[in-house]
């Protein structure tokens, strides 16, 4: 049966990203948020929110939900009312559309006919419906009706690592497979007015943005037709951190997606991440974490700071994660693929020898509900100038 499997590891062959056109500047967001939610009388809470925004290290975010949408659905600005139907009516349509935009860019870079796509993986924590966002995205793209689809809802911020893990397994076990994997989240699912008793909500309003990212994954790239690997996906792993239950979560309620984020999350991740690294890199003989490149989900500034401090990383190791956080905020599952895209583009622009900032080996990390950590050992490819 080995003739049915590919030889060699799967590779990322193309990357595409997309964001809504509507841009919100972080410095202006506290005034905007309290104005549109008719909460300007909550002056002390607004000042707390302003401090959260100031510390976020976010410059701007792309947000689908604009004032016109809020005028059409005025209950969305209230804190705790039944708005799930209105949110889902929007997101069931918009999530596949934004995902399609990212897919189209990845397919264009790949340069092959979309009829060669054999599998589609889609993940989103923004909406749930039947048939799912995978079905609607496939229809929008005009993919073959026999494309093999996988839909994963409610993974959250580690979902970017998950789609790579599953895409790798599919590509390596099905000779000739070309897997289109897409992550898309639109935070209209959790936009609500403020409350003095819900400070976690304010953190979510301050850091989350909207985005979609897609990758084409396949083994044995066919260079005769122009396929070129960007990164090899060498190994994958997933773990639930000890004593972390309840620290990150999301709950679908009549008022939308209710978000949980415990203050201990940065400490929990930083205290446990080296164990994940040792398990991943001991077989390769690597123990110097400054000798690898990093594709890290920037869940927030504090997570990056704590990991950098704990592992004694050089300040440039998270430059791509910090850039994506600054320009887009936390876009949930797609964010880490934005970081991967930023890394390979910056490596080319700066004349580096490989797609991984000049390093051969690297790691991709996603952190999310559970607290779940998804990791992928990644190998860069030489850049030909």
Swiss-Prot record:
GO terms for molecular function: acyltransferase activity, transferring groups other than amino-acyl groups. PROSITE patterns: CHALCONE_SYNTH (PS00441). Its main location: cytoplasm. The keyword Transferase applies. One of its GO terms (cellular component) is cytoplasm. Belongs to the thiolase-like superfamily. Chalcone/stilbene synthases family. This is Polyketide synthase 1. It comes from Cannabis sativa (Hemp). The lineage of its organism: Eukaryota, Viridiplantae, Streptophyta, Embryophyta, Tracheophyta. The gene is PKSG1.
């Amino acid at each position: 049966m080995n003739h049915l499997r590919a030889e060699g590891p799967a590779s990322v062959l193309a990357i595409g990203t997309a964001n809504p056109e509507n841009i919100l500047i972080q410095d202006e967001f506290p005034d905007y948020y309290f104005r549109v939610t008719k909460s300007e009388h909550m002056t002390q809470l607004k000042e707390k929110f302003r401090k959260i925004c100031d510390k976020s290290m976010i410059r701007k975010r792309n947000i689908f939900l604009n004032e016109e949408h809020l005028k059409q659905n005025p209950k969305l600005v209230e804190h705790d009312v039944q708005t799930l139907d209105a949110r889902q009516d929007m997101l069931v349509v918009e999530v596949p559309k934004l995902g399609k935009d990212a897919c189209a860019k990845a397919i264009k870079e790949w340069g092959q006919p979309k009829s060669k796509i054999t599998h589609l993986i889609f993940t989103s924590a923004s909406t749930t419906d039947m048939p799912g966002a995978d079905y609607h995205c496939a229809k929008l793209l005009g993919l073959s009706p026999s494309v093999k689809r996988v839909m994963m809802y409610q993974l959250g911020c580690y979902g970017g690592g998950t789609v790579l893990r599953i895409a790798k397994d599919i590509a390596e076990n099905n000779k000739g497979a070309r897997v289109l994997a897409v992550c898309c989240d639109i935070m209209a699912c959790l936009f609500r007015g403020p409350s003095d008793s819900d400070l976690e909500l304010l953190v979510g309003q301050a850091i989350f943005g909207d985005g979609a990212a897609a990758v084409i994954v396949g083994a044995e790239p066919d260079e005769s037709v122009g396929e070129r690997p960007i990164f090899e996906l060498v190994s994958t792993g997933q773990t639930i951190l000890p004593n972390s239950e309840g620290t990150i979560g999301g709950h679908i309620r009549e008022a939308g997606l209710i978000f949980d984020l415990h203050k201990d999350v940065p400490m929990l991740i930083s205290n446990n991440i080296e164990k994940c690294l040792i398990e991943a890199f001991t077989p390769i003989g690597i123990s110097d974490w400054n000798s690898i490149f990093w594709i890290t989900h920037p869940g927030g500034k504090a997570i990056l700071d704590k990991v950098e401090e704990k592992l004694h990383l050089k300040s440039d190791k998270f430059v791509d994660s910090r850039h994506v956080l600054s320009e887009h905020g936390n876009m949930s599952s797609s964010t880490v693929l934005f970081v991967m895209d930023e890394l390979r583009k910056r490596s080319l622009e700066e004349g580096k020898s490989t797609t991984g900032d000049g390093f051969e080996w690297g790691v991709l990390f996603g952190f999310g509900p559970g607290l779940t950590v998804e990791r992928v050992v990644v190998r860069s490819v030489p850049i030909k100038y």
